[in-house]
């Protein structure tokens, strides 16, 4: 587990933005589900290089995300966006999708987050490691 805890001027971050596969996502989300905070959210990037298992793996992570107690979950990348179709409309309301990290950065610049505990988890290729400086 290469996660790093960082407290910024505005938020508390758990950063694990360099590696993501199904088992590491499970571990990170299970751990995050145990945390108590009034304003929990996650920013999850696609898991890369999963091949034929990708659709099922991303759908499984979405189901797990529903159990973490988060108020919102931002999804970055096309695999998570496709997986959203496996959820009901009520379930999908928790999630917000972004094409790439640049879209997330634009949102954070327009609408900064404050007083959140945020898990940032995704494959290195999703470039989520660029986000902490904006949080």
Annotate each PLM feature.
Residues 1-135:
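ATP-dependent carboxylate-amine ligase
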